[in-house]
Amino acid sequence: MLTSRPGRSIFIFLLILSSLVIIAIIFFLPETLRSIAGNGSLRLAGIHQPLIRCFTKDPPYIQDRDGAYSPPKVTAKTFIEPLLLLKEKDILLSLIFGGTIYAIWSMVTSSTTGLFKQIFHLNELQLGLAFLPNGTSTFLFHLPFVQTDSPYQGLGTIVGSTIIGNLMNQAYRAAEDDYRTSHGLPASYSLPKKALPADFPIEHARLKHTKWITALFVISTSAYGFSLSTPAITSLPGWIAVPLLLQFFIAATSNAVFATNQTMVSDLCPGKGASSTAINNLVRCSMGAIGVAIVEQLIAGMGPGGAFLVLGLVTVAVVPLLVVQWYWGPMWRRERMGRKVKGAGS
């Protein structure tokens, strides 16, 4: 409907829609940061409470906070602390690998409109529907306990929770069982996830399934370009299903890497969940922005086949980062934990 109106109509629509969302947030959304709101039962004040609380009675479970409470202060260190994680070798390797996959997925997604409109002559509605395979597969490998930044989301969420979530949980439980057996711990003992022992192989547990997922991502990305490069093939009836299916696998495998990567970075930064999420988003979104900026020139210069083959080879080029992390990551993590213990004791 908006495509039939003047060019500014869509921006006016987005302005109205975003304004309604902001108003709803101001009126109804309370502060959820645990250090401020606790488990949701603490009385909020100032900007932390929604405006609706000014006109209604507090729920019966609301309690006054301890008088000794002092609100967390925002200082320069608050913004610098996430950047300091880049000094850690194992964390940096995880961020670079995850950022590379994110950039390539973003390049596939951002180039879809131009390629499909040119090759398959789709209208605006059909172009929108072409994103469904990408979007539903985003949730195919989405973890319910891991944050992702994917803008395309669909019914695959249900399937995703049972695939990558179960795979990662199984790998972690297997590693935990082996650790208990080797250390003579009772079967009922559960390792504290926020304070894992230095000799627990968390890197192996988290990266166990990354190898085949990355291989499938490389194959799908490389084949995707060639599925769009030959007019004699792309003109065949129903051929559009082939690149759409490959997009499904590209999005599914890339989002599996995102979920694994975010979990891995969080495990390497116990107690720094906000900082690890912030630096992960900063790195991969920066790399994604660079990729989106050059993808059109890459396709124009090499064609879809050559361009996406190069992107597949780029992924292969960063796979050694996983190998390095697999073998040397545990040592670097133990060294970091040792420095932390020494710092706390001094």
Language model: regions and residue ranges:
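A single, central transmembrane helix in multi-pass transporters
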Residues: 93-103
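C-terminal transmembrane bundle
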Residues: 102, 106-346
